[in-house]
Amino acid sequence: MSIFRTIALFVYLFGYMIVHYSVLCKAERALAAGDTETVRQLVKKHIPHWSKGVLNVTGVRLSVEGLDNIPKDGPCVFVANHRSYYDIPLLLAGLNEPYGILAKEELGKIPLLNRWMKLLGCVFVQRDDVRASVRALNDATAIVESGRSFIIFPEGTRYKGEEGGTGEFKAGAFRIAVKTSAPVVPVAISGARGLFEAHGNRATPGTVYVRVLPPIQTAGMSRAEQKQLPDAVRQTILAEL
């Protein structure tokens, strides 16, 4: 059964984008014309719908808690643990609206998907190139400075260890929040690896829990507090896994 779900996943994944290709082109024309409101409306309508479809097709049940912890008076930086390829559609479906993501450069090479991600405000990072990584962080910082919230996975890659753990949270991504004085909103994702990777990269039904935790203010942080921030956020997330 899992093989059929996996096939259905990829058929839906790209089928939706092909069927809605005219919407993509409309959004790109609006962006080129400087009509950011039309872009925002189209992205807000279609990205969550696409993401929820990915979950529905593969029998994923999503439980979300803590949406009231998302700041309403300005942008924030969501910091989530990274366990699965599913993490991106889980957050795009589960948060109050879709946000840009600091994503690996490989996603920027996938036809159609890369164009939607650019409209969403995603930034692609080349992890093995220091200068390119700095440019990506600067681009993400500019997005938050413009008033839009942003999502980062500070581990830099999927954590493949035991359930309930995370990799090291790298400090670089936290500079986005510190430079913009935006609050950090920790997000704990549990159960995601069991949807795909734990079963030999085959789509498997299951329940995932996304917990949005209280924001951590970065404005006025001392150097010592900034240095401790990555591990403090990691420990906050670990306590919820």
Describe the predicted segments one by one.
Residues I3-F4, V134-L241:
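Non-catalytic C-terminal accessory region of glycerolipid acyltransferases
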Residues I3-R29:
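A hydrophobic membrane-anchoring feature enriched in long, contiguous, low-charge segments
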Residues I3-V11, V39-V43, A177:
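Structural motif marking the loop-to-transmembrane transition
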Residues H20-A33, R40-K44, L55-V57, K72-V130:
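Catalytic core of membrane glycerolipid acyltransferases/transacylases, capturing the structured
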Residues H49, G53-P75:
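A short, well-structured juxtamembrane/interface segment
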Residues K52, P89, F174-R175:
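Active-site phosphate/pyrophosphate- and oxyanion-stabilizing loops and adjacent acidic/basic residues
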Residues V64, F78, I101, I152, ...:
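Generic preference for hydrophobic
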Residues E65, L102-K104, Q126-R127, P154, ...:
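Thr-Gly-centered strand-to-loop micro-motif
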